């Protein structure tokens, strides 16, 4: 299932991301804000557990997410603000990291680092800013599936139809929650209109 959350607020935030004047600090902040909206939508029907807490009225029980049953995984480095946003909302969630680099000539992706916690029987939330060709995301999903995750949810800020179709073809069971689906990929496999290089813009490494 692919769900696009192209609401007026999200469209306004995405427009700010597209602006070339938006600096790294502001860019990361907007990415985190959009991620919180995506997370809320992705988990709106998630099961809850009872939690007994001390309040100003004494001991009381409330329904909450079982944070230990979730893992958030980011594809370095553009996805780091998204991971931070998820962990700010769910501070007891476990986190994992994948480093996948795209060959600019072949446009194929290559994994060069992975650090994942125990995923068996858990819901894994994969976060990445852009879904272009879908190669990196398919690789990430393949890796997480070997860890016997119960369910995988993908959160993306923007994506191209070609990449979404590629992921759906390889992983038809995948749930993707995305804030904006852009027009297409150009001849260099960049998303149009896109955001530019999200990692460079987040961390001020644009040459």
Model regions: which residues?
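PRPP-associated nucleotide enzymes
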Residues: 1-207
């Amino acid at each position: 299932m692919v769900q696009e959350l192209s609401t007026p607020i999200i469209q306004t935030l995405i427009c700010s991301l597209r602006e070339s004047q938006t600096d790294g600090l502001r860019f990361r902040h907007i990415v985190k804000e959009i991620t919180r909206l995506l997370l809320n939508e992705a988990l709106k029907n998630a099961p809850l557990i009872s939690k007994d807490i001390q309040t100003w009225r004494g001991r009381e029980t409330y329904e909450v997410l079982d944070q230990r049953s979730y893992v958030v995984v980011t594809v370095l480095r553009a996805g780091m603000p998204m991971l931070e946003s998820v962990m700010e909302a769910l501070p007891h969630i476990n986190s994992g990291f994948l480093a996948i680099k795209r060959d600019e000539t072949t446009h194929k992706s290559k994994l060069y680092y992975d650090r994942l916690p125990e995923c068996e029987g858990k819901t894994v939330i994969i976060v990445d800013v852009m879904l272009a060709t879908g190669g990196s995301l398919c690789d990430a999903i393949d890796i997480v599936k070997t860890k016997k995750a119960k369910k995988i949810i993908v959160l993306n800020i923007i994506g191209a139809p070609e990449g979404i179709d590629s992921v759906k073809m390889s992983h038809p069971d995948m749930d993707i929650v995305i804030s904006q689906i852009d027009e297409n990929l150009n001849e260099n496999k960049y998303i149009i209109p896109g955001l530019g290089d999200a990692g460079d813009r987040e961390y001020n490494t644009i040459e």
